[in-house]
């Protein structure tokens, strides 16, 4: 993920390949699969993408992340009227908020389905359209609320800059506080709603952009996140069995018996970690939100139309890279 992110961010050709050419080709591929499935073609009905990655969430996430990457390229390269328009600088906030709300909706869906399953089967296990048993409950509701708060932990919505060499789109006011709040919230989302993928799209996929932003790519966490997320979603949509079966498959402790078989209703569950992490997610997001408003109030500013973290180490290091 780190390597592909570097290729995509350092050249226009790399960015256009990963976020325009490849998505167009994959869209044609996905369309062909669903047309084939609609006509009862065996190759389509048994295709990995059709069997394991058919939920609304995965497609929404893939295309929302990809549109984000394209928008970030427009901003950092100042392409056309959009790339030079002041109003378009809030695009990163809008697309990130959309991505968060997609996950929030999925969290609430899992809670509702878990409660419905409890009424009908006496268990909170419910089977997703992709053949994964999920365990919906109050942790989904609390994490959904944490996600909504996380949206409003983004500050300085119009304070978007291009780096001096135009490799990067900078959001200097998005410092480590937001990154921490987002990472914990998003990990809890993947742990609860994509449990069989949580090692990859949870731990690894969150560490990749955070590592890059912390070490060499200051102020660019959101671009790193969008790039790695979009590229991973494309890979996982085409080759989902990489993480679903075989030596690379990982199951969380939720599956108390250590088995996830779509044909067999699970018995025992251990949702303890989901509860612990979701409480941590909610607490961290509330604390970050409070810090933001405390700083904004002391400065007498609106934290969404103005930058809140001017003067902090993260902010100043990012601004040192910005075009003046």
Question: Where would I find each of the regions flagged by the language model?
Answer:
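Alpha-helical transmembrane segments and their cytosolic membrane-interface
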Residues: 1-40, 136-183, 274-285
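Generic multipass alpha-helical transmembrane bundles of integral membrane proteins
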Residues: 86-219
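An N-terminal, globular interaction/scaffold subdomain
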Residues: 1-91, 95
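Hydrophobic cores of alpha-helical transmembrane segments in multi-pass inner/ER membrane proteins
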Residues: 1-2, 60-76, 142-158, 204-210, ...
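Hydrophobic alpha-helical transmembrane segments and adjacent interfacial helices
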Residues: 21-41, 70-76, 93-110, 175-192, ...
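Membrane-interfacial helical/loop segments at transmembrane boundaries in membrane proteins
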Residues: 39-54, 109-135, 246-269
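C-terminal transmembrane-bundle signature of multipass membrane proteins
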Residues: 1-2, 201-323
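Short, structured coil/loop segments at alpha-helix boundaries
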Residues: 11-14, 81-85, 132-135, 139-142, ...
């Amino acid at each position: 993920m780190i390597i592909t992110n570097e290729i995509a961010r350092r050249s226009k050709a790399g960015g256009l390949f990963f976020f325009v050419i490849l998505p167009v080709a994959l869209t044609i591929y996905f369309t062909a699969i669903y047309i084939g499935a609609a006509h009862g073609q065996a190759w389509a009905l048994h295709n990995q993408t059709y069997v394991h990655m058919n939920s609304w969430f995965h497609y929404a996430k893939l295309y929302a992340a990809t549109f984000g990457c394209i928008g970030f390229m427009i901003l950092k390269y100042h392409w056309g009227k959009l790339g030079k328009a002041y109003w378009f600088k809030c695009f990163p906030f809008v697309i990130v908020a959309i991505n968060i709300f997609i996950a929030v909706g999925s969290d609430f869906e899992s809670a509702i389905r878990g409660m419905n399953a409890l009424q009908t089967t006496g268990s909170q296990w419910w089977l997703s359209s992709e053949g994964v048993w999920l365990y919906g409950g109050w942790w989904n509701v609390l994490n959904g609320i944490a996600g909504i708060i996380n949206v409003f932990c983004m500050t300085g919505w119009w304070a978007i800059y291009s780096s001096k060499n135009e490799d990067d789109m900078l959001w200097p006011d998005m410092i480590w506080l937001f990154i921490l709040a987002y990472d914990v919230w998003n990990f809890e989302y993947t742990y609860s709603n994509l449990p069989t993928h949580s090692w990859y799209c949870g731990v690894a996929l969150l560490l990749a952009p955070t590592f890059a932003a912390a070490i060499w790519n200051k102020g660019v966490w959101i671009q790193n996140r969008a790039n790695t997320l979009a590229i991973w979603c494309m890979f996982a949509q085409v080759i989902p069995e990489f993480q679903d079966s075989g030596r690379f498959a990982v199951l969380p402790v939720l599956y108390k018996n250590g088995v996830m078989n779509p044909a067999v209703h699970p018995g025992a569950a251990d949702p303890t970690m989901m509860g612990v992490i979701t409480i941590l997610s909610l607490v961290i997001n509330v604390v970050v939100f409070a810090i933001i408003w405390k700083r904004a109030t002391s400065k007498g500013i609106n934290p969404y139309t103005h930058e809140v973290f001017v003067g902090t180490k993260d902010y100043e290091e990012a601004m040192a890279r910005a075009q003046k």
